[in-house]
Amino acid sequence: MASGNLTWVTEFILVGVSDDPELQIPLFLVFLVLYLLTVAGNLGIITLTSVDPQLQTPMYFFLRHLAIINLCNSTVVAPKMLVNFLVTKKTISYYGCAAQLGGFLVFIVAEIFTLAAMAYDRYVAIWSPLLYAVVVSPKVCRLLVSLTYLQSLITALTVSSCVFSVSYCSSNIINHFYCDDVPLLALSCSDTYIPETAVFIFSGTNLLFSMIVVLISYFNIVITILRIRSSEGRQKAFSTCASHMIAVVVFYGTLLFMYLQPRSNHSLDTDKMASVFYTLVIPVLNPLIYSLRNKNVKDALKRFLDNPCRSLKLM
């Protein structure tokens, strides 16, 4: 108990996707299926890109890390969400909430920059295939991934520290299905200028920088493809980046839908629906996008299923 008879929050209550009792079991089943598909699909991509000799290229190196990020991002959110569908008391501890926010920020920022790195990789592959192995060398790949995770950790530590530096002493009901910065700050009983500024700066900078890389890469990809004289060559060049282009449009489209809404139409309920998409739906879609449209991945899956024991020994 603090001065002024204010009770400091020690746990939060997550409202969830819906507070309708009749929808809890149906929603549990839907999201359980989504999570199991996420685990199976992304573990499949991780395994194939780790064991198959034909997939030891920069493109599949980045794809493996994207699958790891998607799997981890869903795992930060989904298990607690699924449990809350089945229990009456939908609480999460203060420190558990801080850990969930930090984990979510790490992996969502990592996904943003991994997609940007993959766009650069596709640009180099189409723009200068002869220099591809030199420009996007294993050392460069490791450096890009290391910088991605470093920026993700910096963002997560800074933003989550700012969000939990303010006081929570009134309502503890979060209108969300996981601990996110905006609905948390809406509950604060102290000045939120610093954490709101930190959220704005980091989210804006990360999103803007990665989008610039993606847009410049794809602008140059389109220019390069248009300069190819044969229709067969253009089709082959386009097919090498089609899967990534679809993933980028789906992911950034969801984020832009959430961040570019007019203030008058903005609501936490709308944010929840967008969050469902990029925390639980996109991690299911990415393995499908990259496998169904990718002959190399489909061939690798066939080789793995023909002799899984031999393939696993190559890990």
Swiss-Prot record:
The subcellular location is: Membrane
Q: Which GO terms describe its cellular component?
A: membrane
Q: Please tell me whether the keyword Endoplasmic reticulum is annotated for this protein.
A: no
Query: Has UniProt tagged this entry with the keyword Transmembrane?
Result: yes
Task: Give the main localization category.
Answer: membrane
Q: Which residues are glycosylated?
A: 5, 265
Highest taxon of the lineage: Eukaryota
Give the Extracellular membrane side ranges.
1-24, 79-97, 165-205, 261-271
**Matching SUPFAM superfamilies:** Family A G protein-coupled receptor-like
Any transmembrane segments, and where? 25-45, 58-78, 98-118, 144-164, 206-226, 240-260, 272-292
Molecular function terms in GO for this entry?
G protein-coupled receptor activity; olfactory receptor activity
Bilayer topology term: Multi-pass membrane protein
**Homology family:** Belongs to the G-protein coupled receptor 1 family.
Name listed for the protein in its UniProt record: Olfactory receptor 8J2
Q: Give the organism, scientific name.
A: Homo sapiens (Human)
Taxonomic path: Eukaryota, Metazoa, Chordata, Craniata, Vertebrata
The encoding gene? OR8J2
